[in-house]
């Protein structure tokens, strides 16, 4: 299938081949088409079109030489078939076209329907990142201690210890018999459960919530009573002006427990009434403060004259002390008072009977002190001043 655009001259065979330049270019064109056919790839139309034109030209020259164009041996097939500015066709269509940009080319066969071999097909894509495996995050199973604590709380049994996974120190919730005073003061499920059962009510009468045992093991209420479950009870110890609400003090029926527990060195909390308490014990026996006929726990300003009140205020301003938590704190009181307003509003006594035993079981932090503490909450009906009175008690 070799077509000659010109006739070979016998004297022109002085070149390297016995073909002219146009004949040699046509042979290369046909050989390239044969390579496409052998590799099974489709032949580009740019290679087939020059063959058709050359065939028509040769047939026209054979029939009518007048229609022949003048020969252009300098341009050849490059200008006639492929034209200028076109990209040169692949000389080896079945070979991988991967090169290094200069002279080297891959020697492997191209993958079917691709320009590159199997090795160089995906070389241009970014393969540095591995595919991310989307794993569903499952929550970790609850610990055995938390599960047991939840089951005990649902069954109505108080858990002894609840250990958390956080590095914070774990707190231990006290047993029901240890938590009875705190539950009565700060509220909670044990207070309601104790009121329903008769056995617990008997023990509740024995360990009254208003006789607060100060012990080194539980110097403060446990942190669990300040949790979100008992948020409505967290302010039971604060000053609430709600009529009839006594967080720290008992009603009139608890006076017997107060007198029974006075001999055991317990700290007692009672409802502060308006009745004066008659006693011949002076307010400050060691320093000689106060009047001997006055109440040791309250100062009735309506029964004293102006001279005694002025002298008492000066002495208390200079020498009144409060022994609280092992520290000697001096309480400074303002020099001026409204005597008329104070005379109309008698003070409410703060302290109950002091324990007079040396070896008392209610000693706090191993000390032999017999200090008592009592607090009052003002009612909504009356507007009474709250005054803290403290003294040293030297048992002889």
UniProtKB/Swiss-Prot annotation:
<comment type="similarity">
    <text>Belongs to the GRF family.</text>
</comment>
<dbReference type="GO" id="GO:0030912">
    <property type="term" value="P:response to deep water"/>
</dbReference>
<feature type="region of interest" description="Disordered">
    <location>
        <begin position="117"/>
        <end position="176"/>
    </location>
</feature>
<dbReference type="GO" id="GO:0005634">
    <property type="term" value="C:nucleus"/>
</dbReference>
<dbReference type="GO" id="GO:0006351">
    <property type="term" value="P:DNA-templated transcription"/>
</dbReference>
<feature type="compositionally biased region" description="Basic residues">
    <location>
        <begin position="120"/>
        <end position="129"/>
    </location>
</feature>
<keyword id="KW-0539">Nucleus</keyword>
<dbReference type="InterPro" id="IPR014977">
    <property type="entry name" value="WRC_dom"/>
</dbReference>
<feature type="domain" description="WRC">
    <location>
        <begin position="90"/>
        <end position="134"/>
    </location>
</feature>
<dbReference type="GO" id="GO:0032502">
    <property type="term" value="P:developmental process"/>
</dbReference>
<keyword id="KW-0804">Transcription</keyword>
<feature type="short sequence motif" description="Bipartite nuclear localization signal">
    <location>
        <begin position="86"/>
        <end position="105"/>
    </location>
</feature>
<comment type="function">
    <text>Transcription activator that plays a regulatory role in gibberellin-induced stem elongation.</text>
</comment>
<dbReference type="InterPro" id="IPR031137">
    <property type="entry name" value="GRF"/>
</dbReference>
<keyword id="KW-0805">Transcription regulation</keyword>
<feature type="short sequence motif" description="Bipartite nuclear localization signal">
    <location>
        <begin position="123"/>
        <end position="130"/>
    </location>
</feature>
<dbReference type="GO" id="GO:0005524">
    <property type="term" value="F:ATP binding"/>
</dbReference>
<dbReference type="InterPro" id="IPR014978">
    <property type="entry name" value="Gln-Leu-Gln_QLQ"/>
</dbReference>
<dbReference type="Pfam" id="PF08879">
    <property type="entry name" value="WRC"/>
</dbReference>
<feature type="domain" description="QLQ">
    <location>
        <begin position="18"/>
        <end position="53"/>
    </location>
</feature>
<keyword id="KW-0010">Activator</keyword>
<dbReference type="Pfam" id="PF08880">
    <property type="entry name" value="QLQ"/>
</dbReference>
<feature type="compositionally biased region" description="Low complexity">
    <location>
        <begin position="144"/>
        <end position="174"/>
    </location>
</feature>
<protein>
    <recommendedName>
        <fullName>Growth-regulating factor 1</fullName>
    </recommendedName>
</protein>
<dbReference type="GO" id="GO:0006355">
    <property type="term" value="P:regulation of DNA-templated transcription"/>
</dbReference>
<dbReference type="GO" id="GO:0009739">
    <property type="term" value="P:response to gibberellin"/>
</dbReference>
